[in-house]
Amino acid sequence: MADVLDEVYAVIADRKVNPKEGSYTTSLYNHRKGIDKVLEKIGEESTELIIAAKNGGEKEIVSECADLFFHAMVLLAAKDIPFEKIKEEFERRRK
């Protein structure tokens, strides 16, 4: 599973330095609100996950959780924080 997350993060980070027309990720980086747009999306996806957890089924929860993970990864890349740092933090907490 970590491999697919690494791959997704690599694409997200690449879109920052190599924008691609029509890319949703590129549109987040280039939004007129800047990082605030990414933060808005994180807030929105967090709320949607909470609602899915309260009222939805497994499929909705998984979908909203993936959306939240994705936008958190965009934030990391926007702030030049490697995804590896998150994995290291989980490793540290596991000990």
UniProtKB/Swiss-Prot annotation:
Pathway where it operates: Amino-acid biosynthesis; L-histidine biosynthesis; L-histidine from 5-phospho-alpha-D-ribose 1-diphosphate: step 2/9
UniProt cross-references to InterPro entries, sorted A to Z: HisE (IPR008179), PRib-ATP_PPHydrolase-like (IPR021130)
Subcellular location, record wording: Cytoplasm
The entry's keywords: Amino-acid biosynthesis, ATP-binding, Cytoplasm, Histidine biosynthesis, Hydrolase, Nucleotide-binding
This protein's name: Phosphoribosyl-ATP pyrophosphatase
Catalytic activity: 1-(5-phospho-beta-D-ribosyl)-ATP + H2O = 1-(5-phospho-beta-D-ribosyl)-5'-AMP + diphosphate + H(+)
Matching SUPFAM superfamilies: all-alpha NTP pyrophosphatases
GO CC, one annotated term: cytoplasm
Domain of life: Archaea
CDD domains in UniProt: NTP-PPase_HisIE_like
Assigned EC number: 3.6.1.31
GO terms classed as biological process: L-histidine biosynthetic process
Family: Belongs to the PRA-PH family.
Organism (species): Methanocella arvoryzae (strain DSM 22066 / NBRC 105507 / MRE50)
GO molecular function, one term: ATP binding
